[in-house]
Amino acid sequence: MARGYDETEVKFRLIKLLHSSKSGISGVEISEKLGINRVTMSKYLNKFAAEGTITQKNIGNLNLWFVDEDIEQLNFPDDYFLVQEKFLSHVVDCNERPVYNLIKNCINSKAKMDKIITEIIIPTIPQIKKLFDDGKIGKSEEQLMTGIMLNSIQMITHHSGHSESGKNVIILSADSESLLLSESAAAAFRSQNWNVFSIGDISSSIDVLFDLELRKLLSKTWKSKDGVMIVLVFSQTEEGLKFISDSFYSVK
């Protein structure tokens, strides 16, 4: 990108400008109003469009730029608490699009991927569980909200970098209630360039052959025995945690 401009500041000013117009603004007009030459502004517009921050529409002979009303530029770390409140509200209302746009806003505003997990998504998990335990939402609503949060976690995973050799972690959930936490942990580790093997909920796979399954798993995921391999288990019960940990100790 061209020198002399702060990308975050350009994006903030651009979003504010586009929000002021319902009919779209041409690239030439954007360049004039932001005081940035056309060539440089064109590069910014194409970059922000590729990120999904803005969109372009051809209307007649004009190419006009728009921004969705849910798109905004955030300031981190100051906005983590505000975003978590919005995230919870949208999830409880089962409004998928605002949830995904909120995560997109976080990513485009340069929030740290692991912080999106720890400051926004993970605090929401017990709040949803409490609503269910208190009888304020039903099972189907809880499942829908869980799916929305899993999709949000997947969005973060898609923006993770390449894994580093020698940093390996197996993450699993001993029950369905721990799935969101295990998937959150997987996304957080991926954001730190770990080579993650996320197994998910294995409660239906626990039987007398479980030790054998673990041997096969380790032989495939850690063939070279290079670096470190961490096994991270999430469980709502001490029994589930102990059973799986004992199984791994038996095959280490």
Residue ranges of predicted features:
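A short acidic, leucine-rich amphipathic alpha-helix
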Residues: E29-S31
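Short helix-capping/hinge SLiMs at alpha-helix to coil transitions
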Residues: L18-S23
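C-terminal regulatory/effector modules of DNA-binding transcriptional regulators
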Residues: G135-G138, N151-K252
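Residues that mark the N-terminal boundary/hinge immediately upstream of a DNA-recognition element
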Residues: V10, G24-S26
